[in-house]
Amino acid sequence: MLKLTSLCTLVALILSGFLPSAKLVAQNNWILASEHEGIMIYTRAMQNSKVKAVKVVCNLNATNSQLVAAILDVETCNEWVYHSKRNVLIKTISPLDIIYYAEVDVPWPAENRDYVVHIQITQNPQSKVISINSPCIPGYVAEKAGIVRISNSVGRWTIAPVGKSQVRAEYTLEVDPMGDIPAWLTNLFATKGPLETFRRLKVHVQKDEYKKARYTNISN
């Protein structure tokens, strides 16, 4: 999701590639599709796919560590990622390297989607810019009846400090949602998914435990 995810943010945004009435404002082949409340949503075509890639850009009142803590707290994704249903931490490889399972609630008549994601976080020590890669891992968890498994998806975060306790977050997602999706459902996710996800993230990231979070390899 698109999802929006931490890729858990992720697939709550999966249908955003069909955003209607895109404005002709390009940014490295990205086209600005909408802008509300400081949340900018871009799309661009993907080769051999009817689904477009999506990029969301906005400023958040948070430190690097604060936003990283919120993204890594995958089991609370349903509190902020649009239509996120269930998220389970599978494995902690290191404090900045985890694997988790997520299920996205997709309205009838389409079936729910699920996926397994590997989140890896690094920081440039000079610029303090954080990079988060979150590709899907096919075959890591057995598929479930009645749920469509997403096996091809890559989510990326770039987080850069822009002031005291403020960061600029850029999230991109390329995904194959698998199977047919009704047009009305596509439009629902396209108009609401990215905006609702980042609206909620702005609030969610203010939890005290995230403000207090510290990581050995992350500088604010």
Model-derived features: where do they sit?
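Positively charged n-region of N-terminal signal peptides that target proteins for export
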Residues: 1-6
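Bacterial N-terminal signal peptides
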Residues: 8-20
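Eukaryotic helix-grip
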Residues: 25-220
